[in-house]
């Protein structure tokens, strides 16, 4: 199934995103799932599919909308408030919010899409998920129209989240490291802050984001896991 082009997205916005009533009809006319529910950096803004490309702050919900007849998929983005209303109307649950920040109560027991990871997860499993979330945050730092998470990162993240006791493999850490390195060489990074590695980005966050607690940023054990099999690999985190 191919992803919609700009023209098809414009038509989709016009026909299905102009108000609450037509947004609800998305669930009737297409197959719909939540692609991601993500918290943004303080002050970070992304564009909504809602009429007028309204700015979204704080967090967004991205859907995967499949037109099975035309074999086209869309990834509309809405504010958390709008997205929650859509999910409620379709009787669909709100998934966990992905965030590089730690809430005071960690979202445990809220039952409404909190960020809690449970009580006794595999430590490296949790750290690799955190690493992926920091990588994702970096990759959309200067993006106004976010696209789905990098396919390999998404696959690994969802596996780790589904199986919190899964023992992290060295090739999984290497795949995340490779994705980070690939992004760092892209123009969108080079022409802005030009971070040389993920630690540069974490330092940027520690300097520029106040009043929020970051997830654990000590990834030493993950580096060691990767180096046991790939000692010559350049580390980007």
Regions found by a protein language model. Give the residues of each.
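Extended, alpha-helix-rich binding/interface surfaces that flank or overlap catalytic cores
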Residues: 1-237
